[in-house]
Amino acid sequence: MATPNVVLIVYDQLAASWLEAGLRGAADLPNFARLAGQGTYFSRCFSTNPVCSPARASIATGLRSSAHGVMQLGYALSPELPTFMGALSEAGWHTAACGKLHLRPHWESLEPDYRPYGFSEQHITEDPRGGAWLDWVRAEHPEHFRAVLTTIWAREMDEFSEYGPQRENLAELMAGLPMPGNVYELPFPARVSQSNWITDRALDSIASTPPGQSLLCQIGYVQPHNPYAPPRGFRRFVNFDYVPEPVPAAWRDDPLTPPAFNARAAVAEKHEWRAVREHYFADMVHLDRQLGRVLDGLADAGRERDTYVIALADHGDLLLDHGLIYKDSFHYDACVRVPLLISGPGLAQGQVCDDLAAIEDIYPTILEAAGLPCPRPDERRPVPGQPTAPFCAGRSLLELARGRTPADWREAVFIESFNNLDSRLPGNWVKTVRTADARYSLYGEGAGEQLFDLAADPDEQENLAADPTHRRFRQQMRDLLLQHLLVERYPHPPRDLFRLGVH
């Protein structure tokens, strides 16, 4: 094979449930279908901490939150931890980051520096919308600058008070501008949007990388994360006859439900599900067009045959399923199951893989694609200042993408949340074990638990945790969760000092 390349596309808050509904006819998504036809769609891929920063840290490191330390929003990933971009950079690859990475807190800076993690080129724009994209809008599309400012929700960030080299007070300017809410169409053309700008920068990186130079291009889109704001003209590509209605909030009558559910339900009640889903699906259509541009750009650059394309999301969005919205510690399917598509040289085409995958599998998958040593799940990796590193939780998915399932492939994935934006109480901490046909979630401080037989109850409506007829089922799932916690909490002594026969 010629020099390999990797394009990693990370969508923000894109649930597998909604992409699959779109592909069944709810939205016009020819390029997602195109990528699925060129590779493998993993139908059971899970976010192991369904919130932005922790999930993205797991993608980068192959570790779960309890190992890499990014527990929730507001945490920064240590640049000392091994990452796939760092490994590829050390191996001589050109490494480019375009769009959203969110490995550091948004409030830290409008222009975060991700070069310490291993990127040699970066074009960053994230949720606060300041920085490179905003500066480009002002320079190239000044007629839309004020319209863009109306969509900035993080107006209280200090940097907006002394913005840019001229130290302009954009905060004062924005204070006089209306905000459009949480469901709207962008008040400027699609060509000016963050998503288009991110794709433009990625295409520039692909086109400008010299032939023969291996390229890693990570493309991070800010959408379809709320606010649900597609460009104008894309709602017409949504066929509402195929958009599913929200599943009922059966937890309201369940005494084992944690209190945090009520707080999030109060947020959800302010939204009308038809409007939310229509705008969300329209944003998927816009992202589909960006995917098509990326795939075409690889072909134009002569890199199509030698490039692994990996597309996934950090977590999902409930979109009013179960009377809830967004993500966090509500481990229903639309929150934790994410789309994952992988195509590349030597991989199966048009395949659907039902084996369990997790976002921490991306790290070893990229290393194997690059021909670099791939850590085993039981292999420690050195970290500066520490004699040993945490277990690598991920496994390469390339064997599955070739159509072969290893005999020792996992039978469960583990999901954790440590708090959410509604509360920091341990009662909102939750540990979940998810198998192919069951889910068990245990909340902290006795706040509640959930047990679902997904084969009989795919919509997760009947909590069996307190049902005496399912006591054995509950115990089996609790034991599976306990075994995971025992292994994950294995102490990290200085084993490099150990010598056989020394006590």
Regions found by a protein language model. Give the residues of each.
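Active-site-proximal cap/lid insertion segments
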Residues: 2, 10-26, 137-356, 369-389, ...
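Non-transmembrane alpha-helical segments in soluble domains
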Residues: 11, 33-37, 60, 85-89, ...
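C-terminal cap/loop subdomain of S1 sulfatases and analogous C-terminal strand-loop tails that border
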Residues: 126-129, 143-145, 315-321, 361-363, ...
